[in-house]
Structures are given as structure tokens and as C-alpha cells.
Amino acid sequence: MVNTATNTGFITQIIGPVIDIEFPNGKLPPIYNSVIVSDVTCEVQQLLGNNRVRAVSMTSTDGLKRGMEVTDLNAPISVPVGKSTLGRIFNVLGVPVDEMGEVSMETTLPIHRLSPRFTELETKPSIFETGIKVVDLLAPYRRGGKIGLFGGAGVGKTVLIMELINNIAKAHGGVSVFGGVGERTREGNDLYMEMKESGVINASNLSESKVALVYGQMNEPPGARMRVGLTALTMAEYFRDVNKQDVLLFIDNIFRFVQAGSEVSALLGRMPSAVGYQPTLATEMGTLQERITSTREGSITSIQAVYVPADDLTDPAPATTFSHLDATTVLSRNLAAKGIYPAVDPLDSTSTMLQINIVGSEHYDTAQDVKETLQRYKELQDIIAILGLDELSEEDRLTVARARKVERFLSQPFFVAEVFTGSPGKYVSLADTIKGFNMILNGELDELPEQAFYLVGNIDEAIEKANSLKG
């Protein structure tokens, strides 16, 4: 921890969140050390020569002036980790900001750590079962993988995130860490309130909560937004490496991490790269992403919301992110408008795990048949709109009927949405999911009405619902 021999310098220049500090000869703090001046914590980013360093502030530099004394803390920023973090909200420095009292600093870790060695990695790819039918069947997540979550406002990103947090806790005995990177303060507050309401955070007994929250919102300096992802990741690494758990790490939004790095890079005087981004874009992204992985002890599976500026997928920020992703989950406004939740687009969502040698032939064939049926239905929709269903061939009418059942069967009641829908949530195993879709596509359930498949768990519930509709 902190060395007792204090090393002090003084401020020579302040430009916004960037501070130049002069230290005594031979006492320069190394890069990434944290230094503190009048309650403002900064991180050393550059050694300038002439005994001066350039540091980036993690909080506002209001009130600082030249000549003020700066203390080197002789260590990088360190944050609390472990069970005491569950149910709490932290800032980039690991300080609780939820007015729920202090957090035990008994166990802390520095936010800058090396990624696991190759010998520690779990090399055999395995599926991370979420209990959500559409995800597990059509775009399965890799244990220790990275998933991009794409979707506009109001299509159900937050509810999907909360359901995943709930399911990993129940099915895998795991915990989650949520890193709010450069998003709206209001959204962070709404998420916290919804988590309390749905039981993901247990306000009366915090140790039973399933998630720790780390926020660096868009009103904060770029230094905080650039480092808050590392703070969340450090907390997740402790649960993986020490508690040997499966961890879900949510980063909302990974684009803001890049954006903050771009701001800091410009403030540090680096020459910009393509589209004005930092020249170190790939390195910064790689440093974060390489720490998110499976080891033999546990795993960190990361779900990252990806904002695509001006819907341009070739922009360097999303393009760099894509190279790290194992799967993409795309939320569709059209499905949300139809009331099909989760509104995951079955044709746009992809996964590198959907290969015969990984998931097996039954899973692979079922997924391809489902996609084929839905694609054919999509192609026929224009004809149906112009000429009507009666003008289709017998075979196409059957395809449409089955596709509509498949589409409805991809919906599912969520545990965290129980308070809104009144329907109890359902966790559906992968085997049950495959069995259900096979029965629909094989024509075994052609006589059942399509509304029987809407918002049910496994196929037995759909059959039961059909019987109650008849009765």
C-alpha cells in the first residue's frame, strides 16, 4: 500500500483536467501512479522531462491553482473489491456515491493489472447458458466472451441486462458488475431504482444483492470516464480469480470509453489519428478487452452496449470494438412494437459460437431451420401485404403459420419484469429450447393457435396454454 515516505511536488500548469507537476530531482512518480492535490486525485500520464510530469484529473479541477502542493501516493488508483461492493454504487476511485455509508477497504486492488497469462486461460470454448431462448438458440454467448448489445432507446436493453444479472445469480451462482461509462446520470439513477424494485439489489440486506455498480457519467472529466471501465473490470476480476465465480461485466457504453480516451489524448497533445481519434485507440481497447476472459478458475463474460455514431459501422470506434466481439445481440424496434419481448432480432444477431463442432449438430440444425423459416416469412411479407395470405401456395401458407409461431415462441416472460407484467418469469434450458422449436418446425403443433406460443417458457407451457384457450 502507500509508502510512508511522502513525495511532494507542486503544480506548474493547469489546462482543464490536465495538470503539470514539478517534483524534486530523482523523485518523479512512475506513469499510472496516483497523485493527490487538495482532495483531487489525478493519474500520471506523461513524464515531460525537467522533473515534471503531466497528470489527468479524475474529478473537477475547480479551485486548484499553480504552486499548490501535490502528494504522490506511490501506487496506482486502488479500489475496494469483494462482497462489500455488492449492492453499492461507486465512482472511478472506488468511493461509494449512494449515501449508504462507508465500504470496507480491507481488500483493495489497483485498477491497472496485467491480463491473465496464456497458461491460465481456459482454451476450450463453451456456451454460457442464459436461460433466454432467443439468445441461447440463435446467438449463444461464449463463457468468458464479449458480446455487443445494439439497440436504440426504449427497446428493452435495460430489462434484458437486468434479466441476465438475475439469471447468472440463480443458475450459475455468479455475480455481476455494471460499469456505467459516460452515460446519462438519469439513466444510472433509473437503473439503480429498477434494480431495487426487481430484487437484483436487496436494499434491506445488501450482501444478498447480485450486482455492484460503478458509474462515471457524462458530466464527469474525461479522465474519470476513461478509467471507470477499468474500475468495474478490477472488481469483476476479484470475483473471478479469488471467489472463483462466473461474472457478468456490463459496460454501457463502450463507445464513451473510446471518446474519453480521445479527449484525454488531445489534452495530452498527441497527434490525432483517423477521424480525430487517439493514435493509441487499438492499444487502449486491447488493454481493456484482453483482461476480460475465462481462466481455469472462473470467467468474466462481458456484455457491452455499443453506440454507433451516425450509424456508421466503419467509424474507427465501433470498428475497433467489433474485432473483439464473439457475439452480437441486436434489439429490434419492429419486434418491440409487436410486443415481442425480449425484442432480440433473430436474423441480425450473430455469434461465432454457432458452429457444429461447438454446439453440436442438433442445436446448429435447429438454429439454421429457425432462421430459414423466419427469413422466408420476411420475404413473403410484401406479397401478403399486397395480395393477402390466400394468394400464397399451400407450402408458403404453412411456412408463414409456423414462422408466426416461432416468432411468438421467441418471446419469454422475464423474472425482473414480473412486477410490470404480472406473469411469473421463466428460465428455459437449452435442451428445452431446442426441443420446442423442433416440434414447431416439424409440424407437430400445427393445430395449436399462435397466441398459445406468446410469452411462455418451454413448449409444454405453450401446449397447456392452448388447452386452456380451447377450454
From Swiss-Prot:
What this protein is reported to do is described as:
Produces ATP from ADP in the presence of a proton gradient across the membrane. The catalytic sites are hosted primarily by the beta subunits.
GO cellular component, alphabetical, reads: chloroplast thylakoid membrane; mitochondrion; proton-transporting ATP synthase complex
Lineage, top-rank taxon, reads Eukaryota
Give the similarity note: Belongs to the ATPase alpha/beta chains family.
Give the catalysed reaction(s), semicolon-separated.
ATP + H2O + 4 H(+)(in) = ADP + phosphate + 5 H(+)(out)
User: Where ATP is bound, by residue?
Assistant: G151, G152, A153, G154, V155, G156, K157, T158
Which Enzyme Commission numbers does its entry carry? 7.1.2.2
Query: What InterPro entries is this protein classified in?
Result: AAA+_ATPase, ATP-synt_VA_C, ATP_synth_F1_bsu, ATPase_a/bsu_AS, ATPase_alpha/beta_chains, ATPase_F1/V1/A1_a/bsu_N, ATPase_F1/V1/A1_a/bsu_N_sf, ATPase_F1/V1/A1_a/bsu_nucl-bd
Biological-process GO terms, alphabetical = proton motive force-driven mitochondrial ATP synthesis
Supply the source organism for this entry.
Rhodomonas salina (Cryptomonas salina)
Q: Which interval of the chain is the signal sequence? A: none
Q: What would be the name of the gene that encodes this protein?
A: atpB
> Which CDD domains does the record cross-reference, listed alphabetically?
ATP-synt_F1_beta_C (cd18110), ATP-synt_F1_beta_N (cd18115), F1-ATPase_beta_CD (cd01133)
Q: What is this protein called?
A: ATP synthase subunit beta, chloroplastic
Could you describe the subunit structure of this protein? F-type ATPases have 2 components, CF(1) - the catalytic core - and CF(0) - the membrane proton channel. CF(1) has five subunits: alpha(3), beta(3), gamma(1), delta(1), epsilon(1). CF(0) has four main subunits: a(1), b(1), b'(1) and c(9-12).
Location comes to: Plastid, Chloroplast thylakoid membrane
What is a GO molecular function of this protein?
ATP binding
Q: Which UniProt keywords apply?
A: ATP synthesis, ATP-binding, CF(1), Chloroplast, Hydrogen ion transport, Ion transport, Membrane, Nucleotide-binding, Plastid, Thylakoid, Translocase, Transport
- Entry keyword NAD: no
What kind of membrane protein is this, topologically? Peripheral membrane protein
Which residues form each disulfide bond in the chain? none
Which one Pfam family would you cite for this protein? ATP-synt_ab
| EC class | translocase
